[in-house]
Amino acid sequence: DVSSEVEVLKALKSLFEHHKALDEKVRERLRAALERVTTLEEQLAGAHQQVSALQQGAGIRDGVAEEEETVDLGPKRLWKDDTGRVEELQGLLEKQNYELSQARERLVTLSATVTELEEDLGTARRDLIKSEELSGKHQRDLREALAQKEDMEERITTLEKRYLAAQREATSIHDLNDKLENELANKESLHRQCEEKARHLQELLEVAEQKLQQTMRKAETLPEVEAELSQRIAALTKAEERHGNIEEHLRQLEGQLEEKNQELARVRQREKMNEDHNKRLSDTVDRLLSESNERLQLHLKERMAALEEKGRLSEEIEKLRQEVDQLKGRGGPFVDGIHSRSHVGSTTDVRFSLSTAAHVPPGLHRRYTALREESAKDWKPAPLPGVLAATTTPALTVTLRSPMWTRMSLGAWWALRLMSSHLVAILDAQTLAMMLQEQLDAINQEIRMIQEEKESTELRAEEIETRVTSGSMEALNLTQLRKRGSIPTSLTALSLASASPPLSGRSTPKLTSRSAAQDLDRMGVMTLPSDLRKHRRKLLSPVSREENREDKATIKCETSPPSSPRTLRLEKLGHPTLSQEEGKSALEGQDSNPSSSNSSQDSLHKGAKRKGIKSSIGRLFGKKEKGRLIHLSRDATGHVLLTDSELSLQEPMVPAKLGTQAEKDRRLKKKHQLLEDARRKGMPFAQWDGPTVVSWLELWVGMPAWYVAACRANVKSGAIMSALSDTEIQREIGISNALHRLKLRLAIQEMVSLTSPSAPPTSRTSSGNVWVTHEEMETLATSTKTDSEEGSWAQTLAYGDMNHEWIGNEWLPSLGLPQYRSYFMECLVDARMLDHLTKKDLRVHLKMVDSFHRTSLQYGIMCLKRLNYDRKELEKRREESQHEIKDVLVWTNDQVVHWVQSIGLRDYAGNLHESGVHGALLALDENFDHNTLALVLQIPTQNTQARQVMEREFNNLLALGTDRKLDDGEEKVFRRAPSWRKRFRPRDHHSGGMLGTSAETLPAGFRVSTLGPLQPPPAPPNKIMPEAHSHYLYGHMLSAFRD
């Protein structure tokens, strides 16, 4: 195999490099040895010279001494000194001779090693040459095989073409034969029909002759016949009128049926999305649980190993204690002095020299150090009164010369330190085992709860699917929902329905009887903890369990939002007598998992030992607000309220109930009345009460139902709402999605500015109402406003008719970006948020990673700015430019596709779907020319005719339908006229984005970068070349989206 040969070659290459490196090291060592030998030989030669010189000098002195008989004592001493030096030099010479012999032996050894390495290197080179030859052979075989494969593919292609041609001919022959047979059958049938018609005409002729005779006989009664005929004509006219009315009624019924079918398709799509999110949620929960379980098991293993190590240390301590006792008996006064100084409080860290440190066992030192660090880090116990005083004394320097005294003192010191640390650490071992066991039990119980929640979610999905497919919703009536409105899941938060926490942080609230549990169900309490759910299962009978199971299937997960950490604070306030151990374990549980801030309420009842695994559940609840089923919630007075979406779903359930529509209208009218009263009184937003704020969130902002329920429980006035920062919105209301928080913050800021007494009148229209729904907008469009303050409440910046439904279902498809619809709907992006989306928001939350698509979205936003976010004006201009080339700025993606088809490029028009090409991009983007459009259409470069047609028609389109003009230069690049820049001057960050208010009115948590406007792209001096991208070869980005 080629891959195995390549791996062999790589291995041989690495082996060759390794041998080469070894060879270099050996040569360096050889060179150093040779230098050392040379030095030693030089030193030896010098020593020989000195010895010879000294010997000559000694001989001369001896001759002089023989001639002179009188010798002084001074020359004798000099001769003795020279003799001692000669002996010293001879010893040095012998030492150097010995070193030289050793160097020569080492040189011989290194030479042998070099020889072996050279032989290995030669072998490796031969193997490498063989491998290269084998690789070349395999490559030649591979090229031959590829050539044979190409020949076979060409033959197969030729045979396939012949087969297709023969098949087409056979098909055409069969079609012709069938056509002729059909024509023959038609002719025969026509012939028979003509014969039958002739016979029928003959019979009619005979009948007519008979009638003629009868008519001639009845000619006298003609006036009576005429009167009867006139009566029949009048009756026929009335019947035709009734028939026309019936046809019109049928058309209306067909329209309603089509609307219902569309609504059913949307419901099915929402259910499919909910199933996907449930699946992702369950996968995330399982992964988090498995990781947490693994971490705890590993922690338990480490702790058990530490306990075993401590047991072994205790045994060693016993041995050392016996040794210390023996040393005390032999030590004498020195050891007694050390112990006396130790008890007085003089030493704990002994500094000793290197010679004395050699007597300390290294393993014992490591175990002691680890034990001391672990004890100091994990346990931190209080000092015991009976422990030896050696643990609290400063340093002592011990310098000992005798090995026996050194062993005795160090042994006593180690025994003292190990005994003290072991006595401190062994006290918490059993407590640690109990804590770990409790954590494992909590994790196992959490896993069981999650599995039960998954089963209940599957039951809900199946029940919803059966109800949607069958179309019978009669089983869900209001009476049953009021009797059974509980959701027995741990996803609900106690703070949404109750203002007081349970009485104990560790105990579980218990119901005294079955009737009490049923009373809770009737009242619509949807926030029972999971521990309470277990007691309810024990109390309720099997019949009531079946009823609860049916009720669970009818209520979506969206009705039970994740609890906020506010319940944790309530828990802490309610239990000031929590033990220190519980508080410590709670802090450890929180620090170990930062994502557990949204943990459920029942985890607090376990002493905060379980990790919060529901932090990602909030993603499930922001998908689609229209897909909510029945949701019972309680307001501050305790009354059961139903939202608009619930009532709209209840309408087709029971046809016999006529009060549902009236109830819906009454509640909707009441909510609109609250907002209308606040508008007419001119009340600032800070003075609004809780019901008005909740109605504003539900009717105008369009927040999901469980967000509204969270605000109903936590926000009691407009002042509280306007003072919420970004972190407080996430913590108090439980909105984890950053874009959901941005939506709410922008709505709050806009309302604060609109209701401010110093707010300027709006510029879009002098008559309008930001508080009306889409239906009321149509009915109130022609009505006159009598209030003088109506202008300040216009829908200039409200965008009530441009909510996230319009953005996802109409605006994004008009830009050619329908593939991002689900992400925009999930993040509840409305027109108010468009000008505040950053590049990070588009990439992370909206999954718009294509730079060309972000550019397309930005020019779509610029188009809305030019129209002052007027939806009716946009639709009007699009309708006017439907059948002619004008006002390209408002063209949709479908209109651009139709224009491409009309210029004769129908084959390439399909490539514009989901491309992001729309009229605003053509009219405003100076870098978008005919070459870029040809790249998007995927017109081949060799098709010059199609590209010429595209260039000519594109220039005509820009000249007739846009403000871009053609430069006089050679490149003929279209550029915008300078007039539009005056209309789009960059605004400073203090303008408050689209709302036009001061940034000082923002709450504390507002981000200026988020609320800052997106600047229009500056005109570059040179044309930006298109860049290769995942979908298209065009990718320049706006400056506001650059990092």
Swiss-Prot record:
The keyword Cytoplasm applies. Residues 590-602 have a biased composition (Low complexity). Residues 544-555 have a biased composition (Basic and acidic residues). GO terms for cellular component: cell surface; cytoplasm; glutamatergic synapse; parallel fiber to Purkinje cell synapse; presynapse; presynaptic active zone; synapse. The keyword Phosphoprotein applies. Residues 688-754, 803-867, 891-960 form the SAM domain. Belongs to the liprin family. Liprin-alpha subfamily. Residues 505-516 have a biased composition (Polar residues). May regulate the disassembly of focal adhesions. May localize receptor-like tyrosine phosphatases type 2A at specific sites on the plasma membrane, possibly regulating their interaction with the extracellular environment and their association with substrates. InterPro entries: Liprin, Liprin-alpha_SAM_rpt_1, Liprin-alpha_SAM_rpt_2, Liprin-alpha_SAM_rpt_3, SAM, SAM/pointed_sf. SMART domains: SAM (SM00454). The modification Phosphoserine is found at S500, S541. This is Liprin-alpha-4. Forms homodimers and heterodimers with liprins-alpha and liprins-beta. Interacts with the second PTPase domain of PTPRD, PTPRF and PTPRS. Interacts with RIMS1 and RIMS2. Interacts with GIT1 and GIT2. Interacts with GRIP1. Interacts with KIF1A. It is found in: Cytoplasm; Cell surface. CDD domains: SAM_liprin-alpha1_2_3_4_repeat1, SAM_liprin-alpha1_2_3_4_repeat2, SAM_liprin-alpha1_2_3_4_repeat3. One of its GO terms (biological process) is synapse organization. Keywords: Coiled coil, Cytoplasm, Phosphoprotein, Repeat. The N-terminal coiled coil regions mediate homodimerization preferentially and heterodimerization type alpha/alpha. The C-terminal, non-coiled coil regions mediate heterodimerization type alpha/beta and interaction with PTPRD, PTPRF and PTPRS. Residues 24-332, 426-470, 864-890 form a coiled coil. Residues 498-617 are annotated as: Disordered. Its main location: cytoplasm.
